[in-house]
Amino acid sequence: MEQQVEQQRLTAKDFHPEILKLFDRYVHGMIDRRGFLDGAAKFAVGGMTAAAILQALSPNYAWAEQVPESDKRIATMMLDYDSPKGQGKMKGYFAKPANLNGKIPGVVVIHENRGLTPYIKDVARRLAVANFVAFAPDALTPLGGYPGNDDKGVEMQRTLDQNKIIEDFIEAVNVLQKRPECTGKVGAVGFCFGGSVTNQLAVRVPSLAAAAPYYGGQPKAEDVAKINAPLMIHYGGLDERVNAGWPAYEAALKANGKKYEEYVYAGANHGFHNDTTPRYDKAAAELSWQRTIDFFNKNLRTGGRATN
């Protein structure tokens, strides 16, 4: 049965809503594996065991390649960089259009709570196809990088100093701004944990020219006044955990006169952009991504802040 689950691409509609909530709590460390299995067993249907449900909800990175590494439109490489206020020696995945002449804007891509997965690398390649230079650091660099297994990646990232991780991504903005391929105008996009970090970059990096957090934790209300970058904020309509922080964030944005757009995708779960799991919502992912590309084109190619 588990082999069949692995081969068949399921969607969120194939699972009881309570199972999806349990899975969200599991991947964010609120319950352990045993807690998920015990909870999911109450909703197991169609001959699927709780273990099979967990397997079915876990990423299948064979589905992540919208832009293959071999795509002749792009060029990629791993970059080393120093993060003196963060974790020290770091690595990141760099993607740009092939045969690039001149300079173009950049986007820092910030991963979820498990390191630099194949999905996040593919997001960087999608940005390169859209004519940006993209840089996706791996917060797990000090531990050897993303281990090839999401559960292990989550465990590894949980052991790291979260403040230092944020410093690593702040430094990544500086690195990308100074790249010879980049105009110096840089935005950020992040997912889940990366959405939270994207919000923090908006607070802490005055030169950030645009920020697009996906279903990320919100900054403290008292920090919102520090935001300079325009924001495009994406939420899944069913993501009760993250969405609970939005009213206070929105009130602070309005009170401080900040420029923002916020979109809630009805019927979409947390993680709806990640096309490697059943929580993926194709319509919401494609619409939100087109909006994000349009947002970056508007704010990074005209006006805004440049450092070079």
Task: List where the protein language model places each region.
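N-terminal export signals
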Residues: 24, 33-59
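Gly/Ser-rich "nucleophile elbow"/oxyanion-hole loop immediately N-terminal to the catalytic nucleophile
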Residues: 150-189, 301-304
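Short beta-strand/loop motif that positions the catalytic acidic residue
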Residues: 233-235
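Short beta-strand element of the alpha/beta-hydrolase
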Residues: 103-112
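N-terminal cap/lid segment of alpha/beta-hydrolase-fold proteins
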Residues: 65-100
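Cap/lid segment of the alpha/beta-hydrolase catalytic domain
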Residues: 140-163, 271-276
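N-terminal secretory signal peptides
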Residues: 1-35
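Primarily recognizes the serine-hydrolase "nucleophile elbow" in alpha/beta-hydrolase
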Residues: 171-228
